[in-house]
Amino acid sequence: MARRPPPYAWLGPGVVLGGLLPTVFLLWDALSGGLGANPVKQATHQTGQLALIVLTLSLACTPARVWLGWTWAARIRKALGLLAAFYAVLHFGIYLRGQDFSLGRIWEDVTERPFITSGFAALLLLLPLVLTSGKGSVRRLGFARWTLLHRLVYLAAALGALHYWWGVKKDHSGPLLAVLVLAALGLARLKTPARLNRPARQ
């Protein structure tokens, strides 16, 4: 007798497919001239905002499961986290293109411009989380150490919000909203019992 798939098994793949749609629209805009006079700058902004939005949604999954009873939210947390990392890498890649892949200019930016430093640090923090996102990593590291490592996502999100704030010159309503939402999610996480933070079965 064939095993029935677990409830909401389609959610993870569905989130990934849906979450990749903005890249299709971005590519279309790039090819059709829809990104304006400075397409690299516009694409950099769009992918950076997408990375922070999707990362924030991933952080909302545990509070949604614990406090609202939305058990399905746990099944999309990993997919959202990987999507956020994808957009962060894409954001950085477009920035590199804007710098003509000049290592000297990039190093100068990273070491002398806090705006770039914060974004680069956020990206570096996300990479080990991606590499240890599988169930095998939980077994190898042990749940306690794995959990401690993956709490770095909150620091990465905070640095991403700071990067966003410093990157906006006039209207800070968007960065301010990001900071407030992340602060609320961090507080919700602190009030979540540790036993309820285990990764959901995929």
Curated annotation (Swiss-Prot):
One Gene Ontology term from the biological process aspect of the record: protein repair
Keywords annotated in UniProt: Cell membrane, Electron transport, Flavoprotein, FMN, Heme, Iron, Membrane, Metal-binding, Transmembrane, Transmembrane helix, Transport
Molecular function terms, GO-annotated: electron transfer activity; FMN binding; heme binding; metal ion binding; oxidoreductase activity, acting on diphenols and related substances as donors
UniProt remark on cofactor binding: Binds 1 FMN per subunit. Binds 1 heme b (iron(II)-protoporphyrin IX) group per subunit.
Domain of life: Bacteria
Transmembrane segments: 8-28, 50-70, 76-96, 114-134, 148-168, 174-194
Cofactor(s) it depends on: FMN; heme b
Compartmental location: Cell membrane
Location, primary (coarse class): membrane
Record's function text: Part of the MsrPQ system that repairs oxidized cell envelope proteins containing methionine sulfoxide residues (Met-O), using respiratory chain electrons. Thus protects these proteins from oxidative-stress damage caused by reactive species of oxygen and chlorine. MsrPQ is essential for the maintenance of envelope integrity under bleach stress, rescuing a wide series of structurally unrelated cell envelope proteins from methionine oxidation. MsrQ provides electrons for reduction to the reductase catalytic subunit MsrP, using the quinone pool of the respiratory chain.
Family, as annotated: Belongs to the MsrQ family.
PANTHER family associated with the record: PROTEIN-METHIONINE-SULFOXIDE REDUCTASE HEME-BINDING SUBUNIT MSRQ
Protein name: Protein-methionine-sulfoxide reductase heme-binding subunit MsrQ
Species of the source: Deinococcus radiodurans (strain ATCC 13939 / DSM 20539 / JCM 16871 / CCUG 27074 / LMG 4051 / NBRC 15346 / NCIMB 9279 / VKM B-1422 / R1)
Organism lineage: Bacteria, Thermotogati, Deinococcota, Deinococci, Deinococcales
Gene it is expressed from: msrQ
